[in-house]
């Protein structure tokens, strides 16, 4: 197995203090005397038998994001949705089940193979019936899984050939991971996992980093780079110049190195906060408050930035929520306040039966991609504020004993600009070896685009918030079921009697009037 650790440090300030020191197991363990954000990449060659899942689906990838935010350096700016997300690409596109169609009694056979693959490689017990389906993909979401799944992968593929060889494990740092991913490298026949770890000194007061290769035959590379200021957070496509030291366990001494790359993921200007309008009923509204955001500028063509960048929000909603695509069509309706409309629904997949109670749904939930139309006359690069509201619906929850509310939680949507590239930019594009290519939302866009992610707003100096919205859904109290049933029955009977009496009164009153008229005529 090969391990590559990339550390972003301030070489101008701490360069003379940085060194690579072998640990207890010689070159198999290093202590790096600097603490800064880092990305660990593990690549493990596998056999055809390990990749049997590709006989049933075209691809499988996994992405995980911590439900709390942290400052991300530009080089590791790719945003991850909170929780664990699995994307399975079908071998052939097919239409998903539509509203009103009968549910299949068994999970799709290919998903059974996917569940087995995830269990073997990541230790994830996934129910194949909980996947939701779009025309080209299956997706799965779990808010409770942590970074330990990626440690399971490293443990599995780090079995030393010599049983007497000591297994060196520093995977406890995975507990601090901010994000992680897992994918299949089809060309190299490798399984790859990447883990991004924040500045441990800043968040956890650790001053050194310990990095190891598990066995003597494994390869370990550690790079410490200084990020040049040319890679700005406002750049349409910023150029990052990286200089630093590279340690390779197959070589005797660290080497100076220099890279020029163009990150596909960038940190956009401004911030976002997300919440439901309060109080929350059965028809809540999700509010996005975007502050000091700016349309990314194209530094290669100053008159070209606005028309190439568009703003999106990618939602993942648990089964307690459903999206009404007919109601969301109203986002495009023009008003005096929104002359171009508020936005438009571009993609929606997941649980199809809108009025089905939550306790009858099998899939984990639904996903939606929405384009947001900015209302601004500000030129590109100029900050402005924007509010966006998305109407939602809550499913009926199962009655509970002694409870009138069911606690629920939904992850924040990802909010980002997507900017198209010109042919010249694509031709001169310098691919970053640190780019994330297997995040679920990236399959919704062409390859030749860059992303500018809008991060969460800090909560009044108390640090970053949890990237989730909590609420209570009203439920029936099962303790009061008998009383409510009896009361309802009495009221129904009483109502029936009242209506019957009213009808009979009219009938008898009509007969009496007829008799009266008849008597008058006879007189």
Curated annotation (Swiss-Prot):
Record membrane topology: Single-pass type III membrane protein
GO cellular component, as recorded: endoplasmic reticulum membrane; glycosylphosphatidylinositol-mannosyltransferase I complex
Task: Give residue spans on the Lumenal membrane side.
Answer: 1-486
Pathway of this protein?
A: Glycolipid biosynthesis; glycosylphosphatidylinositol-anchor biosynthesis
* Signal peptide, first to last residue: none
Q: Which residues lie on this side of the membrane: Cytoplasmic?
A: 505-523
Q: What is this protein called?
A: Protein PBN1
What species is this protein from? Yarrowia lipolytica (strain CLIB 122 / E 150) (Yeast)
Top-level taxonomy? Eukaryota, Fungi, Dikarya, Ascomycota, Saccharomycotina
């Amino acid at each position: 197995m090969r391990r590559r650790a990339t550390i972003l440090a301030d070489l101008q300030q701490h360069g003379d203090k940085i060194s690579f020191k072998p640990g207890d197991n010689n070159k198999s363990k290093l202590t790096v005397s600097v603490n800064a954000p880092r990305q660990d990449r593990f690549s493990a060659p596998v056999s055809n038998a390990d990749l049997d899942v590709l006989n049933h689906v075209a691809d499988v990838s996994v992405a995980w994001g911590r439900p709390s935010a942290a400052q991300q350096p530009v080089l590791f700016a790719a945003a991850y949705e909170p929780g664990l997300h699995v994307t399975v690409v079908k071998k052939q596109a097919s239409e998903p089940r539509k509203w009103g169609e009968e549910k299949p009694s068994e999970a799709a056979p290919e998903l059974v193979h996917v569940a087995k693959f995830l269990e073997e490689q990541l230790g994830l017990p996934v129910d194949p019936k909980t996947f939701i389906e779009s025309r080209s993909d299956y997706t799965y979401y779990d808010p409770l899984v942590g970074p330990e799944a990626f440690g399971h992968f490293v443990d599995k593929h780090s079995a030393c050939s010599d049983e007497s060889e000591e297994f060196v494990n520093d995977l406890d740092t995975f507990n601090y991971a901010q994000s992680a991913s897992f994918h299949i490298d089809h060309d190299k026949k490798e399984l790859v996992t990447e883990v991004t770890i924040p500045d441990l000194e800043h968040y956890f007061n650790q001053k050194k980093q310990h990095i190891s290769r598990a066995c003597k035959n494994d390869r370990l590379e550690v790079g410490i780079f200084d990020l040049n200021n040319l890679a700005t957070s406002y750049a349409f496509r910023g150029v990052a110049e990286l200089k630093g030291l590279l340690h390779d366990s197959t070589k005797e001494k660290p080497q100076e190195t220099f890279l020029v790359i163009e990150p596909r993921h960038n940190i956009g200007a401004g911030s976002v906060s997300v919440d439901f309008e309060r109080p929350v009923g059965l028809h809540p509204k999700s509010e996005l408050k975007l502050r000091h955001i700016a349309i990314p500028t194209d530094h290669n063509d100053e008159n070209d930035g606005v028309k190439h960048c568009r703003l999106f929000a990618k939602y993942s909603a648990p089964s307690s929520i459903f999206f009404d695509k007919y109601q969301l069509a109203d986002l495009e309706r023009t008003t005096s306040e929104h002359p171009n409309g508020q936005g438009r629904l571009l993609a929606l997949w997941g649980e199809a039966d809108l009025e089905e109670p939550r306790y009858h749904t099998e899939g984990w939930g639904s996903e939606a991609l929405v384009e947001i139309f900015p209302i601004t006359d500000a030129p590109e690069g100029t900050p402005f504020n924007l509010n966006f509201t998305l109407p939602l619906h809550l499913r009926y929850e199962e009655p509970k004993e002694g409870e009138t509310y069911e606690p629920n939680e939904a992850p924040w949507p990802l909010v980002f600009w997507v900017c198209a590239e010109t042919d010249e930019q694509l031709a001169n594009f310098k691919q970053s070896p640190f780019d994330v290519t297997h995040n679920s939302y990236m399959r919704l866009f062409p390859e030749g685009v860059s992303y500018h992610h809008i991060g969460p707003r800090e909560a009044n100096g108390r640090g970053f918030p949890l990237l989730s919205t909590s609420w209570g859904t009203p439920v029936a109290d099962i303790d009061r079921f008998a009383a409510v049933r009896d009361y309802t029955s009495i009221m129904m009977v009483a109502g029936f009697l009242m209506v019957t009496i009213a009808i009979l009164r009219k009938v008898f009153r009509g007969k009496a009037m007829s008799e009266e008229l008849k008597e008058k005529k006879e007189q």
